[in-house]
Amino acid sequence: MKKSLTNLDLNLLLCLQLLMQERSVTKAAKRMNVTPSAVSKSLAKLRAWFDDPLFVNTPLGLAPTPLMVSMEQSLADWMQMGNQLLDKPHHQTPRGLKFELAAESPLMMIMFNSLSQQIYQRYPQATIKVRNWDYDSLEAITRGEVDIGFTGRESHPRSRELLSLLPLAIDFEVLFSDLPWVWLREDHPALREAWDLDTFLRYPHISICWEQSDTWALDDVLQEMGRKRHIALSLPGFEQSLFMAAQPGHTLIATAPRYCQHYNQLHQLPLVARPLPFDAQQREKLMVPFTLLWHKRNSHNPKIVWLRQAINTLCRRLI
């Protein structure tokens, strides 16, 4: 028999979403500012409503049942639509708007000053929160914790970062494509040698730990050639790798997007760029499509539409 929504306390759905996110009664209670006992009672009501355990206890926390997993996306969509409904007056007035972004750095650092000025000009009392793009950023977009993401994906056929592998709930727009360059200190000894693959591999490399991986399409291309680079240093972002590559006393080299030349000029880093020593077919596998990502439920959200247009315009002007 179909149950009526009028018989369900909608606060229980908020509790259910937080339990799914936290996988812990105690942590969910903390976020709701209630006691763990109150959350346990809510979970009991939810189990009775759905006639399913929803979660089972494990040594690692609460594990969702198959039914709970099947409801996760619908629940996130429902909560996001509820937030948009409550935020409706903010689309008529600039007061109180929040902008939540997840972006690759230094890409955001190049444009953030101009972007923030545009946001505050249009929405004077808006607040902005920017987080670095990370392995869980797509999930944050799905959960409604991030309005829009801005990051590079990959083109190598074997990459797990292909645009074609994005979740169906994610919409995207490619703003520009970038072929990474090799960045070396101005007095680096490699600059006195013929620039070829042997020279490129002769020196130690700085790598980026990207979405919990120290390797990327470059390493796949090298593997296909039966070659390998020596990764001597792994860092969390491109700005750190460029900073280290510019320091004296070592022979480290960095590979970073071509757009980083704007970042280097801004910070006056003494770096010289060289092309990746590969043929055209190999370089095609290394192209990085820099992409805006948002949830489909936000495709017609006025705030997100405006933000996408603002970032698009800035990219054409600055990159």
Swiss-Prot record:
Residues 25-44 bind DNA. Disulfide bonds: none annotated. Keywords: DNA-binding, Transcription, Transcription regulation. One of its GO terms (molecular function) is DNA-binding transcription factor activity. Residues 8-65 form the HTH lysR-type domain. The keyword Signal does not apply. The keyword rRNA processing does not apply. Gene3D superfamilies: Periplasmic binding protein-like II (3.40.190.10), Winged helix-like DNA-binding domain superfamily/Winged helix DNA-binding domain (1.10.10.10). One of its GO terms (biological process) is regulation of DNA-templated transcription. It comes from the Bacteria. Belongs to the LysR transcriptional regulatory family. Involved in anaerobic NO protection. This is HTH-type transcriptional regulator YidZ. It comes from Salmonella typhimurium (strain LT2 / SGSC1412 / ATCC 700720). The gene is yidZ.
